[in-house]
Amino acid sequence: ENTLPQKSELFVSLPDYCPTPDGMAIAPNGDLILACPNFADITQPACLMRITKDGAVSKWLDVPVLEETGWASPMGLAFNEEGDLFISDNQGWSGAEKAKNKGRVLRLKFENDQLKETITVASGMEHPNGIRIRNGKLYVTQSSLSQIKDPSGLLVSGVYCFDMNDRDIAVTNTSADQNLLTTVITKNPEVQYGLDGIVFNEAGDLFVGNFGDGAIHRIKMDAEGKVVSNDVWAQDTTQLRT
């Protein structure tokens, strides 16, 4: 196994209408789809970019906005086997009061590469971020769950699990949420920002990045999808930078 550092090089430069690149996913045809929430320039509508294997860049579509706020904030992306695209819409990232607890998980359905239908899988989320699909389930990180109080006073974040065909699940961002799979505490008081990236290995173990702690947690589940362990799998506190 090659453990040596690999050389990186610039693949593409993005146009001005994508000042904030974020989540990525490979489309069924092999193109790279890139979410651009565009927090760095809110005059630019949040969009999805299409990047071909040879580096051709184009705008695919503007992400459907939430009527109450007038914007979208796409971050994590994941395709299912049918080619539907699931998006974590992190409305609350802006800090605007009208966007508080207005995050969504969206399902975009397509016909001939054109957006046909937008389905709201879940709404009312505080800080939805990463998203992955496994065995018909959606796993979504929430980087902040401020309504769940730990005795330490430190930040709680978590992972939610939805059925891929769910619609209009009302999330409360509390421990009463039936879709809340597991939670973690971010122990670094200088960076109170929780779970972010998310991925499965072939064995079905779920790995999530705890941003503030610079740690990766491994979450193991039983055959019914219940969490049996949630432990820090990798961390080097000497590498933390604020």
What does each model-found stretch correspond to?
Residues Q142-P189:
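Histidine/lysine/aspartate-rich catalytic loop segments that bind and position anionic ligands
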Residues P45-M49, G103-L106, G158-Y160, A215-H217:
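A short loop-to-beta-strand structural motif that recurs across blades of beta-propeller domains
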Residues H217-T242:
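C-terminal closing repeat unit and adjoining cap/tail of repeat-based domains
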Residues P37-F39, N90-G92, K100, S143-S146, ...:
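Short loop/turn segments immediately following the C-termini of beta-strands
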Residues S8-V12, S58-P64, K116-S123, A170-T186, ...:
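Beta-propeller fold detector
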Residues N2-C18:
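A short helix->beta-strand "capping" segment at the edge of beta-propeller domains
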Residues L108-D113, F162-T172, I219-K226:
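Short loop/turn segments immediately following beta-strands, especially the blade-tip
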Residues D16-D31, A35-N38, Q44-P45, V65-L85, ...:
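Beta-rich, blade/repeat-based domains predominating
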